[in-house]
């Protein structure tokens, strides 16, 4: 079924064509893209690249790994099985039935009963990971696949190392027919993922910045607003709003939505409301409240520019703020580790960390 037309989507067909053209030339079989969240990566992948690939004859399994941080192997099985089904199911089911570890599992029962899309997540990772190769083997030799993995930095987590090695091995032998787009929001993690010798995907895909939206995007949406409203916006007003919102497309659309609803109040009022909404998001408060007091203290210091959170002076400051004795280096390291695994912090240099999400950073720096 075709997706309903979205008049607010700023199509980028030339960029989609460029990425597919690189694969058609045969010089590369994968590409990795990075940009911060909310900058339009997923929109391009889902609304421009995937439809263009489908028109070119690719099957296009897509997975946002941020939705499957605990079960990426099972999620990959689900999207790939949907792409190659039903041809590959019989062999997969035969193999599953022969595995003692899953013979009586609810997951297998669901799969046998035909609930394939829903039940892969019930399999253990040790079962799901080896099945990836079996599914890919069922891909017809002339059928091309574009595998799109969004928030791909999830694969760099230590607990997913076996999956990453297996995926690399399976894709290595199928470069002619399977092309891959990795996209992610953590530049540092992706650089480590593709640039460290010890990582499974070392040198496997060129890593490049995602081309960000700019004045052309702002101009197109400004024209659309002016066709819909009797209170016209000027190009200067919308460009200033775009800059004030960190050149973030998602926030700019919120600003336009507010303006259309209350156009008589003017652009400045719409921008002020949008900034208040963005930087006081209840989800940020929930994230903050979910953190242990020590993690909050460390995060607050890093947000305010403190670099050496392991020094005696800073640890003393942390302890004083918590009404306790200074935590040890090891205790602070554990807090930093939790924040890093939760993708709240990202390491930029040895011992130096930054807040990954700009919106959260601004929220942390606000006056209290």
Model-assigned labels for residue ranges:
Residues 29-31, 35-39, 43-146, 155, ...:
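P-loop NTPase nucleotide-binding core
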Residues 7-20:
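N-terminal pre-P-loop "Q-motif" helix
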Residues 223-284, 293:
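Amphipathic alpha-helical "lid/sensor" segments that cap RecA-like P-loop NTPase cores
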Residues 282-368:
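C-terminal leucine-rich, beta-strand-based interaction scaffolds used for sensing/assembly
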Residues 118-186, 195:
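Conserved Walker B catalytic segment
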Residues 21-28:
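Phosphate-binding P-loop
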Residues 192-240:
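Helix-loop-helix "sensor" segment of P-loop NTPases
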Residues 51, 258, 338:
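Alpha-helical DNA-recognition elements
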């Amino acid at each position: 079924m075709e997706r309903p037309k979205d008049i607010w989507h700023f199509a980028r067909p030339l960029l989609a064509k460029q990425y597919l053209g690189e694969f058609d030339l045969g010089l590369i079989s994968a590409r990795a893209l990075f940009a911060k969240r909310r900058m339009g990566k997923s929109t391009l992948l889902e609304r421009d690249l995937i439809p263009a690939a489908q028109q070119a004859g690719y099957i296009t399994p897509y997975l946002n790994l941020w939705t499957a941080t605990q079960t990426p192997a099972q999620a990959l099985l689900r999207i790939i099985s949907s792409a190659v089904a039903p041809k590959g199911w019989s062999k997969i089911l035969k193999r599953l039935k022969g595995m003692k570890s899953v013979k009586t599992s609810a997951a297998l029962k669901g799969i046998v009963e035909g609930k394939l899309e829903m039940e892969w997540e019930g399999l253990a990772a040790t079962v799901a990971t080896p099945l990836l190769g079996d599914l890919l083997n069922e891909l017809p030799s002339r059928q091309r696949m574009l595998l799109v993995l969004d928030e791909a930095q999830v694969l760099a987590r230590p607990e997913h190392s076996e999956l990453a090695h297996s995926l690399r091995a399976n894709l290595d032998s199928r470069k002619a027919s399977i092309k891959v787009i990795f996209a992610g929001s953590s530049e540092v993690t992706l650089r480590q993922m593709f640039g460290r010798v010890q990582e499974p995907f070392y040198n496997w895909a060129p890593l490049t910045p995602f081309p960000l939206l700019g004045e052309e995007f702002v101009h197109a949406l400004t024209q659309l607003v002016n066709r819909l409203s009797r209170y016209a916006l000027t190009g200067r007003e919308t460009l200033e709003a775009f800059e004030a919102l960190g050149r973030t497309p998602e926030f700019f659309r919120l600003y336009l939505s507010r303006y259309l609803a209350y156009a008589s109040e003017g652009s400045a009022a719409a921008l002020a409301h949008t900034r208040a909404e963005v930087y006081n998001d209840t989800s940020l408060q929930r994230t903050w409240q979910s953190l242990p007091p020590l993690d909050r203290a460390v995060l607050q210091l890093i947000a305010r520019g403190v670099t050496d959170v392991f020094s005696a002076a800073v640890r003393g400051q942390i302890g004083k703020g918590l009404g306790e004795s200074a935590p040890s280096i090891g205790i602070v390291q554990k807090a930093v580790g939790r924040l890093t695994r939760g993708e709240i912090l990202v390491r930029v240099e040895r011992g130096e960390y930054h807040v990954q999400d700009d919106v959260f950073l601004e929220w942390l720096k606000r006056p209290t």
